[in-house]
Amino acid sequence: MEFSKEYNEIDGLLVLTSPLHHDDRGYFLENWKKNDLIKFGVPEDFFDNDLQNNVSVSNKGTLRGMHCQGWAKLMTVAWGTFRMCFVDLRRESTTYKKVTCLDVKPGMAVFVPEGVANGAQSLVENGILNYIVTGYYNPNEKYLGITPLDLKLNLPWDMSTTPIISEKDMNSLSYDEVIAILESDVK
């Protein structure tokens, strides 16, 4: 597998690229291989967790996030382009409160460490996002999140159309409220 690693601004957030092999049928991609991911910085213990694989298919403009469920994630795009934004919420991190955004396409994998909030917006109709998380989703559990349209964060979402956002995400806490919770050690 021919991975390359790109620089990013948040400690532990990895952006990896792998070539797409095109022919008359379309393309083939080795999405990920455990040994290569470890070689490029994904912690080996990521694979020791109760892993759950999720797939979301999103209409153009759909904005999911900013989620911080306390899991690490390995995110790949199966179809389309997603604008992804990340906020480091790990108080012990040298990049605490740092924000970075990038457009992710097929052939790219993003490893999101536990404690880094993340959101994704589909820039195409029927964008397909695949992600592996280190915990099982429980719909009855309240997870930490930041409203994706937080004015202080002012994330560079595509606003050429009205974003489609779930009520739950829209009603998430503000960035300042989440920081206050984290800095008071109250969860």
Regions inferred by a protein language model and the residue ranges of each:
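Non-catalytic, conserved peripheral segments adjacent to functional cores
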Residues: 1-104, 126, 135-141, 146-187
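Conserved metal-binding segment of the jelly-roll/cupin
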Residues: 103-125
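Catalytic Cys-His active-site segments of thiol-dependent hydrolases/isopeptidases
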Residues: 131-132
